[in-house]
């Protein structure tokens, strides 16, 4: 049985770690390489860097952070934010990223996913799906893809899009509820489950963790293969080891460090 992965996520802006509530209101929580080393020591299964500057000028800063992290850490590293071209992906992989997450570029052109998967292999292509619930009370649940940090509606159904990009070669999906992100009220389990049940690739639940029970629910009820969290780890409310022990106690298969 595949073990459930626990993945801390570091939002990086101008080479520094920040954690915003719903992508705004940024708090400086330190140096990304130091934070990554701490998570590596703490037994994180993977680490995710999300570059929220993603401007072209800041690209070199991000590549430097990725390179220094890859040199210092053994856990797999996924990097996303501002990935628009095959060259962007190549540069991140050469800098030491294990996987690259594509967001808006995949929404604008799902064939980009196929091109990337063909060149680099599906195993290192993650598609990030940022979605909001758009169904009204009493209607069957429906979620729509939003871009630009949740500000721009696309009209694209999130579950249909998940099927599309998986068919194009995405090896993994990072599913974030924009309604829940930063709200600490738990994952949108309906969204996570709807996508996980619709595709054959691993789904990472993201957006809204307020406590360790939320991580359990992401897997047990959301059918996710991995759980991503930021605030509860960054600000010391729980350790990765505590998260894994809590999940294992709930009956989930975890990689527990000796």
From Swiss-Prot:
Protein's UniProt name: Imidazole glycerol phosphate synthase subunit HisF
UniProt-listed GO biological process terms: L-histidine biosynthetic process
Entry's family note: Belongs to the HisA/HisF family.
Keyword Lyase: yes
Single GO MF descriptor: imidazoleglycerol-phosphate synthase activity
Any one cellular-component term (Gene Ontology): cytoplasm
Highest taxon listed in the record's lineage: Bacteria
Keywords tagged on the record: Amino-acid biosynthesis, Cytoplasm, Histidine biosynthesis, Lyase
Role description: IGPS catalyzes the conversion of PRFAR and glutamine to IGP, AICAR and glutamate. The HisF subunit catalyzes the cyclization activity that produces IGP and AICAR from PRFAR using the ammonia provided by the HisH subunit.
InterPro entries, per database record: Aldolase_TIM, His_biosynth, HisF, IGPS_HisA/HisF, RibuloseP-bd_barrel
């Amino acid at each position: 049985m595949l073990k459930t992965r626990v993945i801390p996520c570091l939002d990086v802006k101008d080479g520094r770690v920040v954690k915003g509530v719903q992508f705004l209101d940024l708090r400086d929580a330190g140096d990304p390489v130091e934070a990554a080393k701490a998570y590596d020591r703490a037994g994180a299964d993977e680490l995710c860097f999300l570059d929220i500057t993603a401007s072209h000028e800041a690209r070199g800063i991000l590549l430097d952070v990725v390179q220094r992290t890859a040199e210092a850490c053994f856990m797999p590293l996924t990097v996303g934010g501002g990935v628009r071209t095959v060259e962007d992906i190549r540069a991140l992989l050469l800098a030491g990223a294990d996987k690259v997450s594509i967001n808006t570029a995949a929404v604008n052109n799902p064939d980009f996913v196929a091109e990337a998967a063909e060149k680099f292999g599906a195993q290192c292509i993650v598609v990030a799906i940022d979605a909001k619930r758009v169904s009204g009370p009493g209607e069957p649940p429906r979620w729509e893809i939003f871009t630009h940090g949740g500000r721009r509606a696309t009209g694209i159904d999130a579950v249909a899009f998940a099927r599309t990009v998986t068919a194009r070669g995405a090896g993994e999906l990072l599913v974030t509820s924009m309604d829940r992100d930063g709200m600490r009220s738990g994952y949108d389990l309906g969204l996570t489950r709807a996508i996980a049940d619709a595709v054959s690739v691993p789904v990472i639940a993201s957006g809204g963790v307020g406590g360790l029970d939320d991580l359990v629910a992401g897997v047990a009820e959301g059918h996710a293969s991995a759980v991503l969290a930021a605030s509860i780890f960054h600000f010391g409310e729980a350790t990765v080891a505590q998260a894994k022990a809590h999940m294992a106690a709930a009956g989930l298969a975890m990689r527990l460090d000796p």
